[in-house]
Regions:
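Nucleic acid-binding interface residues in structured DNA/RNA-binding domains
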Residues: 23-139
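Short, positively charged and aromatic/hydrophobic N-terminal segments
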Residues: 15-22
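Tryptophan (W) side chains
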Residues: 10-11
Length: 139
């Protein structure tokens, strides 16, 4: 019996360790997402999948969306992140996102989808200067 309990304890510890590792990895993932979203220039949009690919996680577009739900990231220009077909996000945010993008000069189709071919952000073409804090100090 004690061997079984010891085995259960061991699995519980492994489970907790795996959860901690996943939480650390997710925090790093979210921080990478936030860094990219912060660099999307006005008048340009990026897709959830594009952001996921930029951080080397091409199958995690949905998790880019989850990252937007974190209150710590609400100061970021999430209105510049759209679906791959140019559709705007959810009903609660749709009109606000539409007005914000329109005020930045983004053009839409008749059914209010971003003209993605014309306004999708290309980081190489639309380079945004990095903050001096992004560079390590070298002595």
């Amino acid at each position: 019996m004690s061997l079984l309990m010891h085995g259960h304890d061991w699995w519980l510890r492994v489970y907790k360790l795996v959860l901690i590792i996943l939480l650390i990895a997710m925090k790093t993932f979210n921080e990478q997402v936030y860094d990219i979203v912060a660099r999307i220039p006005a008048g340009r949009v990026a897709t959830f999948g594009q952001i996921a690919r930029m951080i080397g996680r091409p199958r995690m577009a949905r998790f880019v969306g989850y990252a937007s739900n974190n209150k710590a990231s609400w100061h970021l220009p999430w209105h510049r992140v759209v679906f791959k077909d140019g559709s705007l996000c959810g009903p609660g945010f749709f009109e606000q996102q539409y007005r914000a993008l329109k005020s930045e000069g983004v053009k839409f189709t008749r059914d209010k989808k971003v003209l993605i071919e014309q306004f999708q952000w290309d980081p190489e073409r639309d380079a945004v200067p990095m903050d001096i804090r992004d560079f390590p100090l070298v002595f």
